[in-house]
Amino acid sequence: MANMFLMFYLSMIMFLFGCMVFVSNRKHLLSTLLSLEYMVLSLFIFLFFYLNFMNYEMYFSMFFLTFCVCEGVLGLSILVSMIRTHGNDYFQSFSILQC
């Protein structure tokens, strides 16, 4: 029982560290995507232990992982298209107002 709460706290601390890195490191798109994936991994760990603790089925974790993979693929496709058009992945060279 205490081990389960330790895992809950560990996943929450991982999520908070991921949020801190996401907010503080805004220079490159790749580092931002990596911090987002770290946050998703910590949420998956929290979800896994929560579902095990409550004796629920693991079907929702499959859907969660599927959407996380889709999010990662979309982020990488944006990164590749940004590098092709601008030559780098700096946020300073990318403007949303440009077409």
Swiss-Prot record:
Which BP terms in the Gene Ontology apply to this protein? ATP synthesis coupled electron transport
List all membrane-crossing ranges: 4-24, 29-49, 63-83
Instruction: Give its E.C. classification number.
Output: 7.1.1.2
Group of enzyme by EC = translocase
> Which reactions does this protein catalyse?
a ubiquinone + NADH + 5 H(+)(in) = a ubiquinol + NAD(+) + 4 H(+)(out)
* Main location as per UniProt: mitochondrion
Keywords from the UniProt entry: Electron transport, Membrane, Mitochondrion, NAD, Respiratory chain, Translocase, Transmembrane, Transmembrane helix, Transport, Ubiquinone
What's the family?
A: Belongs to the complex I subunit 4L family.
Q: What is the name of this protein? A: NADH-ubiquinone oxidoreductase chain 4L
Q: Which organism is it from?
A: Anopheles quadrimaculatus (Common malaria mosquito)
